[in-house]
Amino acid sequence: MTDIAMLPESWREVLGGELQQPYFKELMEFVEEERANGPVYPPREEVFAALDATPFDRVKVLVLGQDPYHGEGQGHGLCFSVRPGVKVPPSLRNIYKEMHAELDTPIPDNGYLMPWAEQGVLLLNAVLTVRAGEANSHKSRGWELFTDAVIRAVAARTDPAVFVLWGNYAQKKLPLIDEARHVVVKGAHPSPLSAKKFFGSRPFTQINEAVAGQGHEPIDWTIPNLG
């Protein structure tokens, strides 16, 4: 249950110790009990999909989300992203609108953000599982301790990164990041509740300027249409 093999290989050295912590064992027992009682998203094999898609040494940007999508077949373990064929959710629609206004990138027909992850954008939710139909149902069960360890691991690397903290929840993680070494892009959350402040904040330009300043290839934010 807490075998190190559950983690993608590139993350094992920096996160393996977390799996031995009492909180993590309790967390895994809780998630298994939840799965025994009904649907939990994402499926087991996609819980660590964000870490799988963006290896530790390739992280250029870390975008912090909150909670997985709680609808059937929506999420696949990357924050803000949905599977091909799933309707683009409101927050991601607003991200696309800002991207289009800022960079003139076409608004895609899908919400599958794997092209970002493959370029080094770690799309990390603070909580990695959720009960079907119940947002925040796995909050404060231990996932936050684990994902704080992910943030700290990236922040401890010699190679600097860009941390994207949208909204008050994400910005509570600021103490985990040394702003003298890394760049933090802060702003309003793209949710419809705060989108007015999000629009015009030009996060994608800020991120790419920082990425280039750190000596890395900027991110191509274009998401291809899947038809």
Swiss-Prot record:
<dbReference type="GO" id="GO:0004844">
    <property type="term" value="F:uracil DNA N-glycosylase activity"/>
</dbReference>
<keyword id="KW-0234">DNA repair</keyword>
<dbReference type="InterPro" id="IPR002043">
    <property type="entry name" value="UDG_fam1"/>
</dbReference>
<protein>
    <recommendedName>
        <fullName>Uracil-DNA glycosylase 2</fullName>
        <ecNumber>3.2.2.27</ecNumber>
    </recommendedName>
</protein>
<comment type="function">
    <text>Excises uracil residues from the DNA which can arise as a result of misincorporation of dUMP residues by DNA polymerase or due to deamination of cytosine.</text>
</comment>
<dbReference type="GO" id="GO:0005737">
    <property type="term" value="C:cytoplasm"/>
</dbReference>
<feature type="active site" description="Proton acceptor">
    <location>
        <position position="67"/>
    </location>
</feature>
<dbReference type="Pfam" id="PF03167">
    <property type="entry name" value="UDG"/>
</dbReference>
<keyword id="KW-0963">Cytoplasm</keyword>
<dbReference type="InterPro" id="IPR036895">
    <property type="entry name" value="Uracil-DNA_glycosylase-like_sf"/>
</dbReference>
<dbReference type="InterPro" id="IPR005122">
    <property type="entry name" value="Uracil-DNA_glycosylase-like"/>
</dbReference>
<comment type="similarity">
    <text>Belongs to the uracil-DNA glycosylase (UDG) superfamily. UNG family.</text>
</comment>
<keyword id="KW-0227">DNA damage</keyword>
<dbReference type="InterPro" id="IPR018085">
    <property type="entry name" value="Ura-DNA_Glyclase_AS"/>
</dbReference>
<keyword id="KW-0378">Hydrolase</keyword>
<dbReference type="GO" id="GO:0097510">
    <property type="term" value="P:base-excision repair, AP site formation via deaminated base removal"/>
</dbReference>
